[in-house]
Amino acid sequence: EILALEKEHKETLRRIAEYKKILGSREEMNRVIKDDLAAIKEEFSVPRRTLIEDGPEAVYDESAVQVQEVVFVLDRFGYCKLLDKSTYERNQETVDTEQVHVIRCLNTDKICLFAASGSLYQIKAMDVPAGKLRDKGVPIENLSKYDGTKDSIVYLTCAQDLKGATLVFATKMAMVKQVPAEEFETNNRMVAATKLQDGDQVVSILPVEGQEEVVLQTTSGVFLRFPLEEISVLKKASRGVRGIKLAKNEELEKLYLIGDNPVIDYKGKEVHMNRLKLAKRDGKGSKVRL
C-alpha cells in the first residue's frame, strides 16, 4: 500500500511539472491543443455527407392575391371582422343596425382609424379575420396599437376612400382645419393625424363632399354657422384656427357640414341648419330656441 501511494505521489508530481510547463509556454500550450484536436479528428472524423455547390437563383413563387370586395364591421364593444359582400348585402339592415362602423373596402386595402387623441391607426384588411354574420370577431386592439380603454374612435374609413379627399378636423377647444388626405399616406401603423394642445382632443372629423358651409355646436347649445372656405387648409402637424369663441367651461361638442338636408336632432327637437344666421368664423354663435 505504501508503494502504491509513493507511485501515485510521483505521478502527481510529474503531472504538476507537465502542467506548469504547458501553462508557462504559449508554444507548449498550442502543441497540446493541436495534438488533442488531431486525436479527436482521427477518432471521430467521417466523410462529408453534404455537397456544397453553386445553386440556381432563388425564386419565390408568391401567388397573386385575389382582390375581393369585403365589408369591415366594428361593434360597440370594439370587436371587428370582415364580412363578404354577399353576406352583407343579404343582411344589410341587420348589420347596419348592430354595428357602429360599417366600411366597404377591398381585401387589399387598409382600414384607417382616426382617434380622439389625434392619432391615426392603420390596419391591413387582410389582417382582419373573416367571419360569418353572428361571429364575434376579434378586439381591434389585437390588430393595432389603438387602446379603447384610453382613446375613442372619431372617424373610420379605408385608405382607398381617402385618396383625393379633404378632411375637416374640430377639437373640443374649438380648433378647426381642413387637411388634404395625402397628408395621411403612410405605411406606418400609427402616426399623428393632428397636433393638439395639452388637454385638447378631437371631437369631429368629416370628409368634404361638396358642402359649402359648416356649423359648430358647443356643449352649452350654442351654434355658429359660417362658410367652409373660412377654415384654413393646413398640414396635419398644425393645430388649426379657432372656429368659435367659447365661454368659460364651455367646449366644442360637434362639427357639421351642411348638405342637402341640413336638419339635426338636438335634445329631441329638430334644428334646421340653414335657418341659422350665417356669420363669420371665430364668432360667439347663438343659442337655438327649442
Regions found by a protein language model. Name each.
Residues 1-290:
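C-terminal interaction appendages of subunits in large macromolecular complexes
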